[in-house]
């Protein structure tokens, strides 16, 4: 088959009838329950693919990605063609207000919410906050839907395999998802009103196109009118010999509402070589004619025209690439459809796209009187109705890179700043991850305290039922905690604030009695005081008996009586007749009635407050092991009694300078257990450290780092190589961390690695609450 037959739209155009209604202008005749669409003799199926970090990769890594992308295209069956469709549009204003901005709660903190909203809106206005989705549509001319489905099963297997090598997720789309993509462009001002149910549609005999069709659509000479909006289609008609891989991302940045489609049709190898041979024969014939004419004119000095020589060189190069480098021939077509509110805006967007294309030595052609055909080619139908295709080899085709960088936009999440590559907002929510525990790592002055305090503030303002516990070794969090009405618990020998580690809240779900719940803590406490080597086998039974005795009044009162204290435990052990009990009591006495009785007092601070900060800056070395253990026990009790079924009522625990806790085996064990168990109790732990190397050499810390799905890497210097190795960062990402200013870095959220920046205006109340710089704090 000749290339002219491949280029023909007879097999790729689908249903081609004169529309008598707006619905009929949508060229889909039938949709099947499994998501297969039919347009006359064309069947299509659609998948969504995730973006990957291409822009921040090294040159070698980029080349590997392009090679693998070539594998994707090479796997297209000969009886199919592919459409790579990138849909780029601004977030809907209503969805933005609903899912990103803070809402009034009338709790005294609405002024802070309003200030955060102003900052988020300013960032969104500056960068547009464009949302991109990428799709693959594969079409075929099989004689029936059964044969088409069989082919799509094979294609899907290939796509899953090939894209998995790129760490790119592939998700098949059902009818509702496919129609919703179209709805966003046919009804631009009604993005949140899409409603479609396949079963009801089939049962009631309704036209599925009614759910997406606009009220009116008009195809003009060089633009399209869709209700009160305007659209225009263009196609690339000229390419350079070597295309820059930034071309696609550059085009998408010019227009806020755009559909960019790349139609790809494989040419069978036999047909490709026939075309090469025919082209070579024409070139050879041209050279013969020229030489013959030169002889006739007695001109023996002239050489073959440069154009013919160039054509000869191109043909030879194509033959070499296909025979020696396994390159495949494709027919490709790049089409864009973009939208605007006015014709003036549409003209400005046209100029912007043409200028950008010219900067990359490409040329856009305005398709006069072909807007309808171009529109139906660009939209994700899997149809091609434009014949001006371009012959490309695999290497050239993969330069049309659909990837740029990963984005995070989780509805109801909090704003972590802006993507350093695209400028889009990073809206994430740790509760959406499989394991939402986090680590924040940075050198001193890298901005880790400000990042963490800002996250606490944003979560506190967003989720009014959430609870927060902060372990603060440097007394940095008190201003923020006090501003939010939280409790600062100062832990030291002479502190006036006390909390009782034997406090207990009965959990109806587990029904664990208090003496059982506290047995492990008290045994660990005795190990800290007496030394683990001095604990005997029977000590646990003695401690268990004493705990059961002191908790009897609490249980008898149905958990309304005051909880016992360590002093009560000391008395219970001392009153037992067993000599060993009295030895344990003697070891406990200094913490029960002696000079270190800080944890033997009833709780005298409001531990029901949903924001509690444990200030351990003044903690002495002798009291530190017991204090740490008591504090962690209190946090553990709070987590265990948490509301488990409501993500908005999660418990958030922050450990600043976590390496201090990792030095003690019992504290380290608590952290290790927390990183594994907290998720079950609707709780999320966060570790903050500047000593990455210490964490990497500690098995417990290494496991925590490796198993945290949310990691914030701010500026790194001496530990940069360790961080790069642990998270597999590219050379550009490494340089970004080395040169990062305070508040800049890389966020790892699940499988996404996103460079970010999060500047905070200094003239805001939020900044004054977060900063630790002298002279800037309130």
State where each predicted segment sits.
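A short helix-turn-beta junction within AAA+ P-loop NTPase domains corresponding to the substrate/partner-engaging
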Residues: 485-489, 700-713
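P-loop NTPase motor domains
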Residues: 52, 59-78, 89, 250-252, ...
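Post-Walker A helix-loop "phosphate-sensing" segment adjacent to the P-loop in P-loop NTPases
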Residues: 458-469, 638
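Conserved lysine of the Walker
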Residues: 448
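Hydrophobic positions on the alpha1 helix immediately C-terminal to the Walker A/P-loop
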Residues: 451
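Hydrophobic anchor at the beta1->P-loop junction of P-loop NTPases
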Residues: 440
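Conserved P-loop NTPase
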Residues: 730-778
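Extended, folded cores of ATP/NTP-driven motor/assembly subunits in large transport
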Residues: 2-403
């Amino acid at each position: 088959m000749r290339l002219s037959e491949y280029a023909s739209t007879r097999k790729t155009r689908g249903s081609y009838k004169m529309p008598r209604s707006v619905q009929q202008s949508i060229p889909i005749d039938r949709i099947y329950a499994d998501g297969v669409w039919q347009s006359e003799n064309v069947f299509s199926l659609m998948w969504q693919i995730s973006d990957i970090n291409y822009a921040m990769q090294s040159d070698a890594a980029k080349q590997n990605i392009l090679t693998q992308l070539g594998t994707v295209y090479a796997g297209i069956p000969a009886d199919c063609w592919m459409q790579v469709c990138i849909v780029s549009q601004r977030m809907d204003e209503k969805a933005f207000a609903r899912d990103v901005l803070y809402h009034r709660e009338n709790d005294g903190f609405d002024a802070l919410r309003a200030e955060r909203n102003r900052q988020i809106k300013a960032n969104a206005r500056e960068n547009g906050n464009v949302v991109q989705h990428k799709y693959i549509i594969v079409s075929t001319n099989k004689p029936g839907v059964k044969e088409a489905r069989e082919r799509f099963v094979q294609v899907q297997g290939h796509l899953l395999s090939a894209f998995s090598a790129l760490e790119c997720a592939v998700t098949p789309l059902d009818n509702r998802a496919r129609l919703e993509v179209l709805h966003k462009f046919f009804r631009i001002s009604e993005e949140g009103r899409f409603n479609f149910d396949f079963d009801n549609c089939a049962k009631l005999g309704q036209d599925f196109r009614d759910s997406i069709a606009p009220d009116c659509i008009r195809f003009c000479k060089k633009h399209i009118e869709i209700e009160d909006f305007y659209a225009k289609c263009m196609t690339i008609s000229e390419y350079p010999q070597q295309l820059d891989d930034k071309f696609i991302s550059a085009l998408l940045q010019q227009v806020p509402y755009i559909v960019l489609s790349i139609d790809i049709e494989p040419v069978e190898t036999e047909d490709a070589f026939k075309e090469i041979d025919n082209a070579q024969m024409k070139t050879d014939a041209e050279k013969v004619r020229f030489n013959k004419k030169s002889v006739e004119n007695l001109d023996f000095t002239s050489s073959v025209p440069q154009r013919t020589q160039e054509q000869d060189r191109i043909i030879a190069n194509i033959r070499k690439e296909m025979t020696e480098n396994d390159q495949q021939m494709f027919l490709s077509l790049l089409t864009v459809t973009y939208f605007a509110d006015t014709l003036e805006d549409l003209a400005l967007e046209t100029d912007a796209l043409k200028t950008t294309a010219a900067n990359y030595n490409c040329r856009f052609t305005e398709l006069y009187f072909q807007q309808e055909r171009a529109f139906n080619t660009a939209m994700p139908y899997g149809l091609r109705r434009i014949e001006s295709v371009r012959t490309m080899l695999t290497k050239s085709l993969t330069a049309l890179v659909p990837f740029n960088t990963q984005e995070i936009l989780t509805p109801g999440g909090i704003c972590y700043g802006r993507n350093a590559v695209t400028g889009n907002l990073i809206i994430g929510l740790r509760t959406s991850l499989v394991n939402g525990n986090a680590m924040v790592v940075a050198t001193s002055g890298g901005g880790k305290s400000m990042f963490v305090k800002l996250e606490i503030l944003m979560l506190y303002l967003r989720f009014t039922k959430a609870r927060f516990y902060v372990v603060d070794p440097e007394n940095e969090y008190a201003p923020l905690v006090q501003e939010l009405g939280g409790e600062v618990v100062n832990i030291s020998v002479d502190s006036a604030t006390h909390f009782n580690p034997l406090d207990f809240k009965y959990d109806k779900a587990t029904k664990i009695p208090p003496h059982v719940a506290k047995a492990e803590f008290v045994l660990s406490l005795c190990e800290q005081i007496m030394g683990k080597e001095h604990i005997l086998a029977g000590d646990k039974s003695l401690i268990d008996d004493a705990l059961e005795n002191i908790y009897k009044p609490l249980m008898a009162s149905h958990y309304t009586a005051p909880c016992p204290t360590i002093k009560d435990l000391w008395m219970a052990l001392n009153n037992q007749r067993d000599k060993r009990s009295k030895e344990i009591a003697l070891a406990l006495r200094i913490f029960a009635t002696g000079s270190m009785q800080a944890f033997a007092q009833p709780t005298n601070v409001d531990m029901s407050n949903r924001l509690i900060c444990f200030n351990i800056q003044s903690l002495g070395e002798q009291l530190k092991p017991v204090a740490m253990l008591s504090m962690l026990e209190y946090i553990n009790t709070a987590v265990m009694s948490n509301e488990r079924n409501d993500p908005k009522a999660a418990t958030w625990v922050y450990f600043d300078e976590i390496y201090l806790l990792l030095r003690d085996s019992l504290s380290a064990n608590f952290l290790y257990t927390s990183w594994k168990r907290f998720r079950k109790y609707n709780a999320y732990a966060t570790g903050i450290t500047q000593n990455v190397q210490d964490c990497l050499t500690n098995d417990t810390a290494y496991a925590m780092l490796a198993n945290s799905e949310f990691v914030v890497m701010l500026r790194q210097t001496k530990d940069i190589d360790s961080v790069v190795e642990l998270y597999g960062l590219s050379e550009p990402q490494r340089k970004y961390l080395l040169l990062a200013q305070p508040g800049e870095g890389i966020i790892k959220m699940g499988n996404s690695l996103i460079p970010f920046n999060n500047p905070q205006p200094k003239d805001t109340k939020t900044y004054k609450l977060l900063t630790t710089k002298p002279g800037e704090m309130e």
